Amino acid sequence: MRINPTTSGPMISTLEEKNLGRIVQIIGPVLDALFPPGKMPNIYNALVVKGRAGQQINVTCEVQQLLGNNRVRAVAMSATDGLMRGMEVIDTGAPLSVPVGGATLGRIFNVLGEPVDNLGPVDTRTTSPIHRSAPAFIQLDTKLSIFETGIKVVDLLAPYRRGGKIGLFGGAGVGKTVLIMELINNIAKAHGGVSVFGGVGERTREGNDLYIEMKESGVINEKNIAESKVALVYGQMNEPPGARMRVGLTALTMAEYFRDVNEQDVLLFIDNIFRFVQAGSEVSALLGRMPSAVGYQPTLSTEMGSLQERITSTKEGSITSIQAVYVPADDLTDPAPATTFAHLDATTVLSRGLAAKGIYPAVDPLDSTSTMLQPGIVGEEHYETAQKVKQTSQRYKELQDIIAILGLDELSEEDRLTVARARKIERFLSQPFFVAEVFTGSPGKYVGLAETIRGFQLILSGELDSLPEQAFYLVGNIDEATAKAMNLEVENKLKK
C-alpha cells in the first residue's frame, strides 16, 4: 500500500528521474520497448506511453517478458490505436497501483483504477499495487466457520465458508444478479461488511444493468455515495486481453484493503472466472508461449493459484469470494473449469426448472454442494436436518415420473406423505429478498441459521402436515408460514 501526497493524476509513482525507453515493435495489444543498458524495468512494472503535444494518447502497459538485448515485451491495458515505433515509453518503476479504501465505494472503475462513471475524480492518496503475494501462513485464520448469509437454502444445504470460495453456476434469467445483490445487501446489514464486484470480460449491457439495479435497491446510495456498500470494477468484453486478465486483480486489491486495513468481512464477486482464464490464454499466445492442453496457456494453474490464494481469511478479516463459472460446452473436464473447481469450497447451482415454478432463489437443493456440510463443522443437528431435506427432495424427484403418468392416488400412503412434505420444503426454500421488494411488494426477510433449522425440522417431523403448501411460499421463518396459513383459512371462510 502507498500513501500518495496529493490527490491528482493517475496512479503512477513520481517520475522526476524518468527511465525512458522507446517502442521498437507493436503487434496488436503487445508491444516491445528498448531501454538503455542497465535500466531494464522489472517484470509487472507499469509502462506509460504518451503521445506528442496535441495527441490524445495515454496507454498503460505491463511488462510481461524480458527479451534480452535491453528489450522488454509488455501487454497494453487499453487500445493501442495511434501508437508508433519510436514513441517514448516511461517506466513508472512500480507495478500498476489502484485507489483503495472508502473512496472506492459506490464508484465504477476500470482496470487502471480510473473512475468511469462520470461522477468526478476519486481520492487517490491511498493506492495499492495489484500484484502482491498471498498472506503468509502465520497470518491465516485456520478456524472453520460458517459465513451466514440469511438465505435459508444456502445456509442449510450448501453453507458458505468464511473466507472461502464459492462457484455460482446459472444461465441467463434464473436470478443470478438478484442473488448477488441480496448477498451484498445482507453482508452490509448483518456483518457491517462491504462488497467488491469484478466484472471480468463482462458484457457492457450486463454491467450497466447491475449498476442501475444496485442504485434502485439502495446498495449504491446515490444521495450519499460514501454510504454505498459496494465498489465495482469492470473490464468489458471489448477491452484488450491485458485489461480483462488484470481486472480481477484490481477488484481483489480493493477487497484486500478492506480486509487488512479496515479489518472487515468482504464479499468479492468475480463474473466470470472463465473469462479471466480466457484472457490469460490470449495474452499467452500473443507473447509467443507454446500452448498447453486444449490450447490453454501453460501457466494456467499458476495464474489461477496466484489469484485464488490471495482470497482467504486472515486474523484481521476475511474475503469470501463468489465466482460465476462458465463451463464451455458443458464439459466439466475442460482445463479452465477443472482448474477452478480445485479451489472451490462450495457450489451454488441455480435451476431453470425452479425459476420457472416461481421459486426464488432458484437454488437447486440437490446439485448445490459444500465442503462445510459435515457434522464436525456445522454440528449434528444442522447436518441431520440438511440430509433429511435432501433425502425427501430426492425421493420426490424419483416419484415425479410416476405422478406424471399415474397420478398421486397410485402412490403408497408413505410416498404421498413424502411428496406433500417435499412440496412444502420446496416452497419453504423460497424467500422474499430485500433487493426484490420493489418488484414483489413483499418485505425482504433475513433468516438466521437456528431459525432455518427449526423450520425444516418442524416440516420433516410432520407437525405442520395439516397446513396448506401455499402457506410456506415466500415467507421468512416458520412462524410466518403458520401465520400465513391462519390468514389463508380466514380468507377461505370469508369467501364461503
Swiss-Prot record:
Alphabetic keyword roster: ATP synthesis, ATP-binding, CF(1), Chloroplast, Hydrogen ion transport, Ion transport, Membrane, Nucleotide-binding, Plastid, Thylakoid, Translocase, Transport
EC number(s) stated in the UniProt entry for this protein: 7.1.2.2
Membrane topology, from the record: Peripheral membrane protein
BP GO terms, sorted: proton motive force-driven mitochondrial ATP synthesis
Protein residues bound to ATP: 170-177
InterPro entries given in the database record: AAA+_ATPase (IPR003593), ATP-synt_VA_C (IPR055190), ATP_synth_F1_bsu (IPR005722), ATPase_a/bsu_AS (IPR020003), ATPase_alpha/beta_chains (IPR050053), ATPase_F1/V1/A1_a/bsu_N (IPR004100), ATPase_F1/V1/A1_a/bsu_N_sf (IPR036121), ATPase_F1/V1/A1_a/bsu_nucl-bd (IPR000194)
EC category: translocase
Record bears the keyword Membrane: yes
UniProt main location, coarse: plastid
Subcellular location: Plastid, Chloroplast thylakoid membrane
Signal peptide annotation: none
GO MF annotation list: ATP binding; ATP hydrolysis activity; proton-transporting ATP synthase activity, rotational mechanism
Assigned GO CC terms: chloroplast thylakoid membrane; mitochondrion; proton-transporting ATP synthase complex
Pfam families: ATP-synt_ab, ATP-synt_ab_N, ATP-synt_VA_C
Reactions accelerated catalytically: ATP + H2O + 4 H(+)(in) = ADP + phosphate + 5 H(+)(out)
Family: Belongs to the ATPase alpha/beta chains family.
Job of this protein: Produces ATP from ADP in the presence of a proton gradient across the membrane. The catalytic sites are hosted primarily by the beta subunits.
Subunit (UniProt): F-type ATPases have 2 components, CF(1) - the catalytic core - and CF(0) - the membrane proton channel. CF(1) has five subunits: alpha(3), beta(3), gamma(1), delta(1), epsilon(1). CF(0) has four main subunits: a(1), b(1), b'(1) and c(9-12).
PANTHER family recorded: ATP SYNTHASE, ATP SYNTHASE SUBUNIT BETA, MITOCHONDRIAL
NCBIfam families referenced in this protein's UniProt entry, alphabetically: atpD
Protein name: ATP synthase subunit beta, chloroplastic
